[in-house]
Amino acid sequence: FASSDLVPDNYKAQLKTLPAGADENTIAAIKAENTAIKTKAIANCMIAVEVASRIGASPLMVMQNMAVIYGRPSWSSKFLIATVNSCGRFEPLQFRFTDKGALGMVDYTDYTYNPQTRRKEAITKQFDGKKIHDIECVAFTTKRGSDGVLESSPVSVRLAVQEGWYTKNGSKWQTMTKQMLMYRAASMWTNAYAPELSMGMRTVEEQQDIYTDYE
């Protein structure tokens, strides 16, 4: 895997070439660096193979859908949904949307830099959502051979604003609202009913939403 062009860079041993006319010290330094690069790539591949064996997936698929966000391994939301749908224990995940009307004014917590303390501090702000609809999403499905419906906790635009996800710089909640609702609802569903499939790891979107300087 570490020598393949099909795997992401985290799993690939991208070795440095020796420059022409390099002295012994330079050659020794580059060889040592290449050894470290190769060791790290192989170690990452071994972790991916171990994760793949635990969730019954292809190692290549795991490598292509597991990313490191802020130093923590995270799943692609699409891959997590596909894993639930293909595990054989559940019917495919479905999503129910409910429009709860205008969002209105919503209090939320933001973090601003305080030059006196040299750190970010939590402050309460108010979001004007009078022109935005509060949409709620629930992920649900049933176990194979059972009629009992398994539902996630509801995720809504109001929740996204209150938690600060909607207002973060670069947030996709404002441009891909329904998609983000689906991704977060699917993650909540998996954590509740099949945590072994995610192995306790958050999704890429979750990590990007909840990361603050306090973590």
What are these regions (language model features)?
Residues 1-215:
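Polyanion-binding surfaces on beta-sheet-dominated domains and ring/shell assemblies
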